[in-house]
Curated annotation (Swiss-Prot):
Protein name, as recorded: Small ribosomal subunit protein uS17
Quaternary state and interactors: Part of the 30S ribosomal subunit.
Protein role: One of the primary rRNA binding proteins, it binds specifically to the 5'-end of 16S ribosomal RNA.
SUPFAM superfamilies on file: Nucleic acid-binding proteins (SSF50249)
Keyword Ribonucleoprotein belongs to the record: yes
A GO cellular component annotation in the UniProt record: cytosolic small ribosomal subunit
NCBIfam families: PRK05610.1 (NF004123), uS17_bact (TIGR03635)
Entries under InterPro entries matching the protein: NA-bd_OB-fold (IPR012340), Ribosomal_uS17 (IPR000266), Ribosomal_uS17_bact/chlr (IPR019984), Ribosomal_uS17_CS (IPR019979)
Disulfide bonds: none
GO molecular function, one term: structural constituent of ribosome
Gene: rpsQ
Organism encoding this protein: Burkholderia mallei (strain ATCC 23344)
Family in the record: Belongs to the universal ribosomal protein uS17 family.
A GO biological-process term: translation
Keyword terms of this UniProt record: Ribonucleoprotein, Ribosomal protein, RNA-binding, rRNA-binding
Length: 90
């Protein structure tokens, strides 16, 4: 038999934190551009994900990378893996 190493390729997405009001949870807005099948125009599609934030360290406006994990709760199956860019404070 072939001894192959099993690697888990978890999906990662980059989005903006739009809410951090829940305990240990942030809401991340992920936007992507999709070409319209008929008109050919690029349209911005978006989706919100609830992501696990163990230490409550991320604030609204932060650009974060989230990674797919096992389900933590009914609506939460993603976890924040790293901070890409902090929000600018004015």
């Amino acid at each position: 038999m072939n001894d192959s190493v099993k690697t888990s390729l978890k999906r990662t997405l980059v989005g903006k934190v739009v809410s951090n009001k829940m305990d240990k949870t942030v809401t991340v807005l992920v936007e992507h551009r999709v070409k319209h099948p008929i008109y050919g125009k690029y349209v911005v599609r978006s989706k919100k994900y609830h992501a696990h934030d163990e230490a409550n360290t991320y604030n609204e406006g932060d650009l974060v990378e989230i990674q797919e994990t096992r389900p933590v709760s009914k609506t939460k199956a993603w976890a924040v893996s790293r901070l890409v860019e902090a929000a600018r404070v004015i």
